[in-house]
């Protein structure tokens, strides 16, 4: 009956208690050191619950348990691990992850219930993939750029599907991309279909650990397939008969090696590159062309909107800052406020 139905808040508490009981039962079981070999260096290729796939120095991948003292382990982490020995004839013991090296960077995403969650580590570069289909959205590009600046990870903007552009369309797209080139961002124009522009992209990926970000349908998986080769193909669903756009199928973060050198972490977490956990000041700092004008407004509490004496707005009016970037800045702030309002309402729901 409806009167006995659990509320959302009660359901969350029941699920949380269940997960705590499961975790306690797992942690009670410790591991016998005699079952494992000598410590070795490795990198986490993927994480599955209480297990991780670790790649050793010789390129072999080993399924490992994780020491309960390790509080956080994600794809890209560099670790100390030990291989499992044969416990009995025909029975092999999984390896075990003993320790995690300090991270050079960590990619996170906000979560309504768990706060900020790490999804990948030691990223050198975030490749922001856009395309003219489903639409060329500068707002989405700007959101990713704010995330990159906040995480202090270098961005690379890649515009895919240029084979669909005629001369007029190419001129328009180049004009839009000049907005980013003019403020110091690198932009590459490619086609995963014709493979135009892939060579400069390969060079930009060599020697780095990258992660590809972008909205659904821009061809991230197709682009990765072209770069990785068929032996490492990241599968995509058949193109939708209704929309004509590819469907996203990646379910767990995983690290792949490019044949030309460099690595990529393919992760579904970047689809939800939320910014609502950031403060407005962090969003402002995420627009690099604003930096020279910060602190020069007439009022210290300037909102950089209709405030009198706003140095940033004056720069927009003088053409020193692109109007589209300024508009997207306020769209991001508005969307953050809306999401935080929904989150606060959800948190009070019993």
Curated annotation (Swiss-Prot):
Gene3D superfamilies: Nucleic acid-binding proteins (2.40.50.140), P-loop containing nucleotide triphosphate hydrolases (3.40.50.300), Probable gtpase engc, domain 3 (1.10.40.50)
InterPro entries cross-referenced by the UniProt entry: G_CP_dom, NA-bd_OB-fold, P-loop_NTPase, Ribosome_biogen_GTPase_RsgA, RsgA_GTPase_dom
Annotated GO MF terms: GTP binding; GTPase activity; metal ion binding; rRNA binding
Biased composition (Polar residues): 1-17
Known cofactor(s): Zn(2+)
Ligand binding (Zn(2+)): 297, 302, 304, 310
Domain of life the protein comes from: Bacteria
Compartments, record wording: Cytoplasm
Major location (coarse): cytoplasm
Boundaries of every CP-type G domain copy: 104-273
Residues binding GTP: 160-163, 214-222
GO cellular component terms given for this protein: cytoplasm
Positions of region (Disordered): 1-24
Cofactor: how and how many bound: Binds 1 zinc ion per subunit.
Family the entry assigns: Belongs to the TRAFAC class YlqF/YawG GTPase family. RsgA subfamily.
Subunit structure: Monomer. Associates with 30S ribosomal subunit, binds 16S rRNA.
Function statement: One of several proteins that assist in the late maturation steps of the functional core of the 30S ribosomal subunit. Helps release RbfA from mature subunits. May play a role in the assembly of ribosomal proteins into the subunit. Circularly permuted GTPase that catalyzes slow GTP hydrolysis, GTPase activity is stimulated by the 30S ribosomal subunit.
The protein, known as: Small ribosomal subunit biogenesis GTPase RsgA
Name of encoding gene: rsgA
């Amino acid at each position: 009956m409806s009167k006995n139905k659990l509320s959302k808040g009660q359901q969350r508490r029941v699920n949380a208690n269940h997960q705590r009981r499961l975790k306690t039962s797992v942690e009670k079981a410790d591991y016998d050191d005699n079952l494992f070999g000598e410590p070795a260096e490795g990198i986490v290729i993927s994480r599955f619950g209480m297990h991780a796939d670790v790649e050793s120095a010789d390129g072999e991948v080993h399924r490992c348990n994780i020491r309960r003292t390790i509080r956080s382990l994600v794809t890209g982490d560099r670790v100390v691990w030990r291989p499992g020995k044969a416990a009995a004839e025909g029975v092999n013991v999984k390896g075990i992850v003993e320790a995690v090296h300090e991270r050079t960077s960590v990619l996170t995403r906000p979560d309504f219930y768990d706060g900020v969650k790490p999804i990948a580590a030691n990223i050198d570069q975030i490749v922001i993939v856009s395309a003219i289909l489903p639409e060329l959205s500068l707002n989405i590009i700007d959101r990713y750029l704010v995330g990159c600046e906040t995480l202090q990870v270098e961005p690379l903007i890649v515009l895919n599907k240029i084979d669909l552009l005629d001369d007029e369309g190419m001129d328009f797209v180049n004009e839009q991309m000049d907005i980013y080139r003019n403020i110091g961002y690198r932009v590459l124009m490619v086609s995963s279909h014709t493979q135009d522009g892939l060579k400069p992209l390969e060079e930009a990926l060599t020697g780095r650990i990258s992660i590809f970000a972008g909205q659904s349908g821009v061809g991230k998986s197709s682009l990765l397939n072209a770069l990785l080769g068929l032996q490492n193909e990241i599968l995509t669903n058949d193109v939708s008969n209704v929309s004509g756009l590819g469907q996203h199928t990646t379910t767990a973060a995983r690290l792949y090696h490019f044949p030309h050198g460099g690595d990529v972490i393919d992760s579904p977490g970047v689809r939800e590159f939320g910014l609502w956990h950031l403060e407005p000041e962090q969003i402002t700092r995420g627009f690099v062309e604003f930096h020279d004008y910060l602190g020069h407004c007439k009022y210290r509490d300037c909102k950089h909107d209709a405030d009198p004496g706003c140095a940033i707005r004056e720069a927009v009016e003088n053409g020193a800052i692109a109007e589209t970037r300024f508009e997207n800045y306020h769209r991001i702030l508005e969307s953050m406020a809306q999401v935080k309002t929904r989150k606060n309402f959800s948190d009070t729901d019993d």
